[in-house]
Amino acid sequence: MKQKLFFIAVAAMGIASCSQDESTGINNGNAIDFRAALGTRAVETTTANLDKIVVTAIDKNDANYFTDAEFTKNDAFFTSTPAYYWPGDGSDLSFYAYSPAASDLGATVTINSTTKTLVDFSPKANIQEQKDFVTANATGNKTNETAGVALTFEHRLSQIEIKAKNGNEGYVYKVTGVRIGQPVSKGTFDFGTSGWTLTQDKTNYLAEYDQAITLGADAQGLMGDGGNAMLLPQQLVAWTPDTDMPNANKGAYLAVKVNITTKDGARIYPVTSVGEYDWVAVAIDTDWQPGQKYVYTLDFSTGAGKVDPEKPTPSDPTDPFKPGEDIQGSPIKFTVTVTDWTDGGAQDITM
């Protein structure tokens, strides 16, 4: 049997049984296969690294021709085992494809004539464990036997990267983690409209590492080895430290786990009783769109942001840093006056 393949990356999903309406008929020619490509905006899942996709097909009678079938990359096409064949009457099949599998996404996928949803999807709290979620829809019939069905996958999440820099040579900043604070964390995706419906649930997303990054004048990535965050598209509502220092309203912010000293070694933040590192934060209110990558560059050259809003109010009298307060005051500056010379008198000295 002649097989064809396509290009995309998908996680494994078991093949469900295929239900075929008798009036549709079966074409015993070439098996159904796909050619896949990805949009170019996000980087985690690409045309080059996509090797499996999960596909559901719906026939002209609104019956599931097959459900959650796994198609695997084979040279230029993606094909399934067992193979599925085109309806012999030339009627169309509607395809709904996605990657990775629902089991990897940690949510429930239902695709049929009336419902086409990924329900209660939540990105992993650990950024290093998050997945890029891609989908594609297409229609095809037996005229696609030779060329395969072209699928163009699009990224359905927003990609977030955090960088930082410090151009102030008077201070040393060392970083061991980042946090994306309080975005909405759960939603349902509609494969038909390609839209999200979000809940009110919020959470924090975290990436930490043992090897500290020392900031310099050029921006450096802070996401660690696990890559960038993949989060739900949404309009963020910013944390407002001026009126809500402890962030009771769960406004959005970025936080960096830092150790701050002067270049001569004087400790600035945190105090010794807290530990070597603690979090500093800044509010954000971006409108995250699906398929868009957002790069935040935090510039510590002129300040260190606010104390972590989720830090408990300190009971240690040696810890002056309360949630939402500025880490540093205004730049140190001086007014300088040079006094006039006074006449000390003249003396004649005999040698």
Please place each PLM-identified region on the residue numbering.
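Sec-dependent N-terminal signal peptides
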Residues: 7-10
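C-terminal motif of bacterial Sec signal peptides marking the signal peptidase cleavage site
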Residues: 14-17
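Short, low-hydrophobicity acidic/polar segments
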Residues: 20-185, 200-201, 205-224, 231, ...
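Hydrophilic extracytoplasmic domains
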Residues: 262, 270-351
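Positively charged n-region of N-terminal signal peptides that target proteins for export
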Residues: 1-4
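Short aromatic-acidic-glycine turn motif
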Residues: 182-194
